Every structure is written in structure tokens, then in C-alpha cells.
Regions:
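Gly/Ser/Thr-rich phosphate-binding loop
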Residues: 298-306, 315-381, 395, 402
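Conserved beta-loop-beta connector loops within the AMP-binding
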Residues: 393-414, 450-451, 513-517, 552
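AMP-binding/adenylate-forming catalytic core of the ANL superfamily
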Residues: 97, 118, 137, 417, ...
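Conserved AMP-binding A3 loop
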Residues: 62-64, 205, 214-238
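Conserved AMP-binding/adenylate-forming
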Residues: 59-60, 74-121, 130-133, 470, ...
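Conserved pre-ATP/AMP-binding loop-to-beta segment of ANL
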Residues: 180-218, 225, 248-254, 407
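Structural core segment of the AMP-binding/adenylate-forming
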Residues: 2-7, 76-80, 106-195, 511
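Conserved AMP-binding/adenylation subdomain of ANL enzymes
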Residues: 237-254, 262-303, 317
Length: 562
């Protein structure tokens, strides 16, 4: 029987008590300055073409240079990518990713950002669901993608970028990877990005509106198969505008890209926000605590939005010193549960407070943030740190299982606002289940106090958040159960001092079968991204189930774990 949910706003929403928490510079209502992130980039290009748009390690790239790279990609793809088509981007944090975004959007295409850690086994679903016409790949990611593309069997225009592209000669020794000096022929079926520099740049550009889909960002589905949230250009611009205003970003700021560009945080809180605020973005190939500390110190980075594990890694680095991060003052964290002990530790070391934030892939990044300059309260009932208050134009309510609007009791958090995705790509069932009358059912359990502060106390969904990456248990279970020795498997998240949570698998073997933890982890590594591979595997006789046969994950989570 379907649940009936009232559309009447809860009391806290009616009074908008959280607006009273806003910084004086944040209005109660916001309108994006641009209709698309592409328009924001074009404005930066028109105003300051020879100003530095980004720093890749120590190597600068101006708006004009980034525009040239994007136009060459656009010209190469023009014959294969029509308006409404999809372009896959599977790469680490390099300027080529930004060039691919611009090129795809100028062609009127949607971008499919894919984690650089995906295996060919995982990629087959993404390709069959998104059906891209073209792809920009990092050199290290090309083998897995090309193998999956061959199995998929559709024609693709593939361009491969090297990690050393755009680096000054003096900068190359600092790179963290070995796959930077590839030369000679490109991987089979692909072309080097560097070879496109001989092409005549394209100049045409599609007309984009705020309701057009900008991104297909994949997140976990209830069946274990990832689903793609349809984030529109309007969604992206609104969220970027919020970050610009909430973080008080001005022309003197320099934004550090600490999140991957395959993740909604990297795409919105870093790339789009830098363009809307017209400020330079500092990036490295991938996150490394020592490299981040060097970049902050060298470039005078002032702000970032990062998983709490990024701050922990920098604190724990042997070269960490407060003077190195003295300019780093506008800090936010989200994507994984934030511990007050880590916030306190960073503040004790630097004098700077880390502000909490909360959002989903489906909400195009943050919907709740702690107002800049304020401290998040701790929920006396659960002990969790508040995720903040809803950002402008965002409605939030807490409902019971029967749809009853709750006061300060714990219930499911639902949201409505201009940053909410328009649904899931080619997935009517999950769209209908999660998006209802303009409200997004988050599956997260939380409460709101009388002052408008929100607290997340649990997840109604069983998603595991490891170092900011979401891991859906059923996907891991399906991978494990494909092993001939395994009868069934169940995966839960267990506490991890560094990652926040880490996957643990409970495995039931077929009678007479044998397997070891090492063997099964190796099996998973061939099929899953590294962060999804269960760190712990426990062999059990059976899995706990109720009378209807439903798996009781709570009992597994509550078991003692060492």
C-alpha cells in the first residue's frame, strides 16, 4: 500500500526558523547568476581571457588556454555527439576533465562522470545505461573502459589524456603516478588528446537552458545496480551560487579541489563554484595529503569542501604545520559522518573551524550547511554533530513511516528545492519511489530542533559511506555471490577510525566448499573499485532473517567487531 504524505509544510518550515541562523551576507532567497555552468565559464572567458583559470600542481592555465582545449575536443566530437547525447568522462583531477565538460556542453550533450576506480566489470552497466557517444579517459583508466566498451559493442569516439598533459617540465617530477610518460600510439580505438591540438578549433555552441540535463551522476540503487541522477544546469548553478554566497567567496579567494571531479562535490563545489565566483581552482592529479599541504602553502588556497578524511590525512601527515595552512580559512566537510573530535583537533592545531555540510548526489551537492562563522551544536539525544540548516530556497521536513509530519522526533528527511535532480535516467521505478510531488525522499533518518538545526542520526537506507564514497551493500553481495564457493553473502558498514565506515562481509559457503579471506578479497578486487572491496570477511553458518525471509542487517551491524 502506498504511503500518503501530506504536502503541508512542517512547523519548522512554516516559521523558517533556520533562516534566523544565516550569516548576514546570506539572503533568504537566491537566484543563480547564470543559467548554466557553461555560461558562467563563458563569462569568465569574456572578462578575463588571460587570467589564470586553474593551477594544475604548479602549472597555470588561463581561461583562453582552457577554452582552446575545449574547442579542439568539441571539433573532434562534433560529428559523433549530437544535442542530448552523452559523453563519458573517466579521469582523475586534470584540466582535461574541465575541457571535456565545456566541450560536451557546447555540443548540447550530457556528461556522465565516472569514477576512475571502476573496473571493466562494473563499467558494463554504466555503458548500457548511459549509452555514451564519446568519452574522455585518463591514460590509467583507458584499458578498463575500452575493454568494457568492446563488450558493449557500440561505436564510441574515445580521447585519452595523459596525467602530464598541461604540466610545465619543472612540475613533472612532482606527479604522483607512473603513467605520465606514455608515448607512441594511443590505446587501440582511441586518440591522444595531445594530437587534437592540430585540429582547427570549433566555434559553434548549443543553447542551454536551466532545465536541460547537465550531468548524469551515478549513485547506488536498491537492486545494487547504480542509477544516474539527472542534475540539470539549473541545479548545478543554484548549488554553486549557494557555495559562493555561503562561503563568502570573493576575487581574493583561491579554491582547492580536494574532492574528485567524478563526484558531485568536485563537479559543483569546486569546478562550477570556481566559474560562478570567477576565482582560480587549484588541483592535483588525485588527493595526496602531502601534495595538498604543498599546494595550499604555495598558492595560498583559502577554501575547500572535502570529506573529513582529507582533513584527518593532512593532520596526520609528518609535514603538517599550522603555518603551512594559514590562508586556509573557509573550510567545509561533507560526504561522510563528521566527528566533533576531528573538528576540535583541526581547530586546536590551526585555529580554524571546519563547518559541517550535508547533501546527496540527487540534491546536486549541499542542501544543509553550518552557517559560516558559527559552530554546529551537538544533539544531546544522539551525540551527533548537526549538519547545519537548509540553504536558501530549500524546504525540508521530517516525516514518520505513515507520512505524519513530525516535530522534533526522528523520522525520514525529505527535501524540496531548486537543486533537486529531476529524476533518475531511464529508471521510472526508482524515480517514482524517491521523487514524489516535488519532494525527494532521502532515506536518511534525522530530526530538527526548535532552532532549525538538523541532525542525521541514522540511514534508513543501508548505504555505507567510506571516505566520502557511497558503497551499496547489494552491489558487493552480488559480486561475492558470483563466486562458485559462496551460497550467500551480506555486507554491512562497520566503524573505521580513518574512513568513517568500511565494508564487512558475512559469507555463507556452499556445503563442502572452501574459501579464504585473501582469496575472496582478491576475487572482489578484480570486480570492484578498491574502496568497495570488503576489508573484513567473516564466515558464518547462516544469515539472520525474519519470518518473511528478510535479511536483518541490524543484527549483523550490532555484532561485536574487532
Amino acid at each position: 500500500m502506498s504511503r500518503q504524505v501530506s504536502n503541508a509544510p512542517p512547523a519548522a518550515e512554516t516559521t523558517k526558523s533556520w533562516i534566523e541562523r544565516y550569516d548576514s551576507s546570506v539572503p533568504g532567497s537566491l537566484s543563480p547568476s547564470f543559467s548554466s555552468p557553461l555560461a558562467a565559464f563563458e563569462a569568465c572567458l569574456a572578462r578575463n581571457p588571460d587570467t589564470t583559470a586553474l593551477w594544475y600542481f604548479q602549472s597555470p592555465l588561463t581561461y583562453r588556454e582552457l577554452d582552446d582545449e575545449a574547442r579542439r575536443l568539441q571539433a573532434h566530437w562534433a560529428g559523433q555527439v549530437a544535442a542530448g547525447a552523452r559523453v563519458a568522462v573517466m579521469n582523475q583531477n586534470t584540466p582535461a576533465t574541465l575541457a571535456a565538460l565545456i566541450a560536451a556542453w557546447r555540443l548540447g550533450a550530457m556528461v556522465m562522470p565516472l569514477s576512475p576506480m571502476l573496473t571493466d566489470w562494473e563499467l558494463t552497466h554504466y555503458l548500457s545505461n548511459g549509452e555514451p557517444s564519446a568519452a574522455l579517459l585518463g591514460f590509467a583508466q583507458a584499458p578498463a573502459f575500452i575493454k568494457a566498451a568492446r563488450e558493449w559493442g557500440r561505436p564510441l569516439s574515445i580521447v585519452v589524456s595523459q596525467a602530464s598533459d598541461y604540466l610545465l617540465p619543472s612540475d613533472k617530477p612532482t606527479l604522483l603516478v607512473n603513467s605520465t610518460g606514455a608515448s607512441g600510439e594511443a590505446p587501440p580505438g582511441a586518440q591522444w588528446l595531445s594530437s587534437l591540438r592540430l585540429h582547427h578549433p570549433s566555434t559553434a555552441s548549443a543553447s542551454l537552458g536551466p532545465s536541460d540535463i547537465a550531468l548524469l551522476t551515478y549513485t547506488s540503487g536498491t537492486t545494487g545496480k547504480p542509477k544516474a541522477a539527472c542534475n540539470t544546469h539549473g541545479n548545478v548553478c543554484f548549488s554553486a551560487e549557494v557555495f559562493k554566497v555561503w562561503l563568502r567567496l570573493g576575487r581574493e579567494d583561491i579554491l582547492l579541489a580536494a574532492a574528485p571531479f567524478s563526484h558531485i562535490t568536485g563537479l559543483v563545489a569546486h569546478i562550477a563554484t570556481a566559474w560562478l565566483a570567477d576565482i582560480p581552482l587549484v588541483m592535483a592529479y588525485r588527493f595526496d595529503a602531502g601534495t595538498m599541504l604543498s599546494l595550499i602553502e604555495r598558492h595560498g588556497c583559502t577554501s575547500t569542501v572535502a570529506a573529513i578524511t582529507a582533513y584527518i590525512a593532512m593532520l596526520d601527515h609528518p609535514q603538517f604545520a599550522a603555518p603551512r595552512v594559514k590562508t586556509f580559512t573557509k573550510l567545509f566537510s561533507g560526504g561522510a559522518p563528521v566527528s566533533s573530535s576531528v573538528v576540535n583537533r583541526w581547530e586546536a592545531a590551526t585555529g580554524i573551524y571546519i563547518h559541517n555540510a550535508y547533501g546527496l548526489t540527487e540534491t546536486t551537492s549541499a542542501t544543509h550547511m553550518v552557517p559560516f562563522g558559527q559552530r554546529a551544536p551537538i544533539d544531546p539525544a544522539s551525540g551527533v554533530l548537526s549538519v547545519g540548516v537548509p540553504v536558501p530556497n530549500t524546504h525540508c521536513r521530517v516525516v514518520g513511516a505513515d507520512g505524519t509530519l513530525l516535530g522534533e522526533d526522528v523520522g525520514e528527511v525529505e527535501m524540496q528545492g531548486p537543486q533537486i535532480a529531476c529524476g533518475y535516467w531511464r529508471n521510472e521505478k526508482e524515480t517514482h519511489e524517491s521523487f514524489h510531488d516535488g519532494w525527494l525522499k532521502t532515506g536518511d533518518l534525522g530530526r530538527v530542533d526548535a532552532a532549525g538545526w538538523f541532525y542525521l542520526v541514522d540511514r534508513a537506507k543501508d548505504v555505507i559511506v567510506a571516505s566520502g564514497f557511497k558503497v551499496w551493500p547489494r552491489e558487493l553481495e552480488l559480486a561475492l555471490e558470483s563466486h562458485p564457493a559462496i551460497k550467500e553473502a551480506a555486507v554491512v558498514g562497520v566503524p573505521d577510525a580513518y574512513r568513517g565506515e568500511t565494508p564487512k562481509a558475512f559469507v555463507v559457503l556452499h556445503e563442502g566448499a572452501a574459501a579464504s579471506e585473501a582469496l575472496l578479497r582478491a576475487y572482489c578486487r578484480e570486480r570492484l573499485s578498491p574502496y568497495k572491496v570488503p576489508r573484513f570477511i567473516e564466515f558464518v553458518e547462516s544469515l539472520p532473517r525474519n519470518h518473511a525471509g528478510k535479511l536483518l542487517r541490524r543484527q549483523l551491524r550490532d555484532r561485536p567487531h574487532e
